[in-house]
């Protein structure tokens, strides 16, 4: 008896399908938020696929499609509700934007940083090496004469840190950044630079 009264009260206290509040407020909000979530997941999934993170991408793909099926079912059930269309389209646009922001914040994978300097290439390479980056330097020839080309493969989340080091040496240096789709991560994991490695070796010798 108590349970029946409870359900009766809930029926009048919570908006149900057919109620204007449910049809024009709650349902569109649900569609919008679900669409934002599934499109954000989809954006990250595509980026993970390009970086060969297959397991994570497959798991995200499952969640993405599951949410999409739930949302599209509600849209089809309410074809006469224009607010559902607006929520669906708005959620798609917002989800794409949020997905790109999340991907930038997560900064998954590695990048190739290429620096071309006519005068300060050796100094830039030394500073990056001292900071713990693996650096390769080679001679090149530009339209205005000889240049030094500095390469380093690093985690994407450390690009800003590396660029501060580079621009402290040469603020207007020319550089380019490319995605490194596949790397030998054991080679490019964080490691001490030349200066720090020398200090570490001395400490170990003292302890011995």
UniProtKB/Swiss-Prot annotation:
Keywords in alphabetical order: Cell membrane, Membrane, Transmembrane, Transmembrane helix
Subcellular localization(s) per the UniProt record: Cell membrane
Lipid bilayer topology: Multi-pass membrane protein
Pfam families: DUF2179 (PF10035), DUF5698 (PF18955)
GO CC annotation terms, alphabetical: plasma membrane
Main location: membrane
Keyword 4Fe-4S appears in the UniProt entry: no
Membrane-spanning parts: 56-76, 82-102
Cited InterPro entries: DUF2179 (IPR019264), DUF5698 (IPR044035), N-reg_PII/ATP_PRibTrfase_C (IPR015867), UPF0316 (IPR022930)
Family label: Belongs to the UPF0316 family.
Name of the protein: UPF0316 protein LIC_12973
